């Protein structure tokens, strides 16, 4: 008799995605991050759901409702810190996942890659709106500064900002709508994840060599299920350690002060995972130019497949491209550091240099070095 998992209409889909899926035999730990992101999303949706049961999206009570969750709700502090630090874990996994895609040439699966860029943008929007909800000083001023950037758009900018705010400043209407969108977007993200996987399973997974692996495939279960479970345990251990030992390590002390429109914090900055983009924004003196650079710093990923000039897919056998890739990583770490520093010498010039190098590396250096490596193959 045929196994029910292969015949049942619903179980068949799960079976073909998680059990009998043919996978390349050479996948390294870098292929764990997709499933880790799934776990992060599940943790965020679950903790967020329970937090939403106690949170109130009103300027008068939002800050106090978060305090109430931490002090009075059973294990409310665990929920709150799991949600806040879970977001950090989410972005660590996201950036490593994107980095893996860049290094091993996974972007040649253009549909999967483009849906991935959509996912990254949606998660970033969700995280930004979530940071506004506790209604601390950095929540309020972060929301004010970032939404105000839209006023740089010619003609419609000012009207657009006031439309998003629901008034003439960040206020009750803004908080309420941000809560509504923050609740809704993760479910849209979950739907996009399904589309992402649908496109991925059309082509099959890439592998570290970048060479087609059709002749050498193994079933996903048990080989990669056990590998993924090890990844889950490692990540959840790290998250638990962060939540239980140092929950405020990645947060901002200013957010423990209730929002006050009359008092601006000395250094307005977003959460650490947006600092690289914030540094690029600040490094351009012109407002509209800064906004365009900010948007391009993420959307540049969409043109990476067009810039692939190498005859090889993966960087595994391309040492010169590897050097440039790790230079890019160093540039992004520098930008993250600069984004958290005050706007003064020498930080401004370091940020401007790193921003220029970021775009030059992706747009010019990498394609040129790939062409050079193609010529070296003929030696």
Swiss-Prot record:
Annotated cofactor note: Binds 2 heme b groups non-covalently.
Misc note: Heme 1 (or BL or b562) is low-potential and absorbs at about 562 nm, and heme 2 (or BH or b566) is high-potential and absorbs at about 566 nm.
Keyword Nuclease: no
Native organism: Leptonycteris curasoae (Southern long-nosed bat)
Name of the protein this chain belongs to: Cytochrome b
Needed co-factor(s): heme b
Chain sites annotated for binding heme b b566: 97, 196
Keyword Repressor belongs to the record: no
Keywords assigned: Electron transport, Heme, Iron, Membrane, Metal-binding, Mitochondrion, Mitochondrion inner membrane, Respiratory chain, Transmembrane, Transmembrane helix, Transport, Ubiquinone
Alphabetized CDD domains for the sequence: cytochrome_b_C, Cytochrome_b_N
Residues annotated to bind heme b b562: 83, 182
Ranges annotated as spanning the membrane: 33-53, 77-98, 113-133, 178-198, 226-246, 288-308, 320-340, 347-367
